[in-house]
Amino acid sequence: MKIKQFLFAFAMILLVIGVNSCKKNDETVKEEFENTFQISADQAVTNNLSQDAEDVFLEIAQDYSIAGNFAPEPVNNIIPCATVTITPATGFPKTILIDFGTSCVHRGVTRSGKINITLTDSVRKSGSIAIMTFTNYFVNMYKVEGTYTWTNTSTANTRSWIRLTAGGRITAPDARVWTHEGNRTVTQTAGVGTISVLDDVFSVFPGTHTVTNSSNISRTCTILEALQRKVDCSNIDKGKVKVQGPNHYATVDFGDGTCDNLATLSIDGRAPRTIVLR
C-alpha cells in the first residue's frame, strides 16, 4: 500500500512539473511571437523610411542638376519648404545639406531637421558613392539616425545601387527605439528615360537586414519578393519580407501595388494582422 501511495504521489509531482513546464513553454512561445510581430512591424517602418531618404536624395539631385544623364535644368525647388546648400558649385566631390527646418510638409509627409550627403560624382554615374547622415532628422515624428551609403552599380542597360546601412536607429513617436543594419540592392524599373522623378519606380531586391529592439532581441529580415516603391507614393506598395524568429517566422506583405500606408503581417501562416507603415 505504501509503495502504491508513493508511486501515486510521485506521479502527481511529475504531472504538476509537466503542466508548469508546458505553461512556461507556452508563455515563452507567446512572448517570442509578440517580439517577432513588433520587430516585423518596426522593420516595415524602417524599409519605408530608408526608401523615403533615397527618394529625397534623388529628387534633390535631379532638381539641382547633379544627377547626370540629362542637360542642366533650372532649379524648380521641387521640395519648396527645404533649403538646399551644395558646395562647391562646380566639380566633385560635393557636400549637400538639405535643411527641412522645424516642419516641412511635402506630398503629405512631414519632415524636420537636416540630411547631410557627401557625393563623389554624378548620382547616376556607375561607381559614384553617396554617404548620408542625419542631424535631428524626423519623418512623420519618427527620428532617423545612422549612416546610409549608396554605391552606384549601374550598367549600360540597368540603373541600380547597393544601399548599405550602418548604425541605423529609429525612435518612434511612442518613444520605442530599435536599431537596424544591412544591405539592399535597388534597381530603377520605370522613369529612367525622363527628367521628372515623379514617374520613377524602384525595385528593392535582394537584401537582408537585422533589426534589434531595446531589449537586445534581434530578428533577421530577408526580402522574399521585390519591394516596389513609386516616387509619387509615400510608402512601399508591393513585395514581401520574411522575418526569422527562433522557431517560427513572420511574413510582411506590402500589398498588390495599391498606394496606401498599410501592410499585413502573418506568423507561421496564421491569420494576418494589419499594420500601419508610418
Question: Where would I find each of the regions flagged by the language model?
Answer:
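Bacterial N-terminal signal peptides that target proteins for export
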Residues: 1-8
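C-terminal motif of bacterial Sec signal peptides marking the signal peptidase cleavage site
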Residues: 17-21
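Low-complexity, intrinsically disordered segments exposed to solvent
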Residues: 24-278
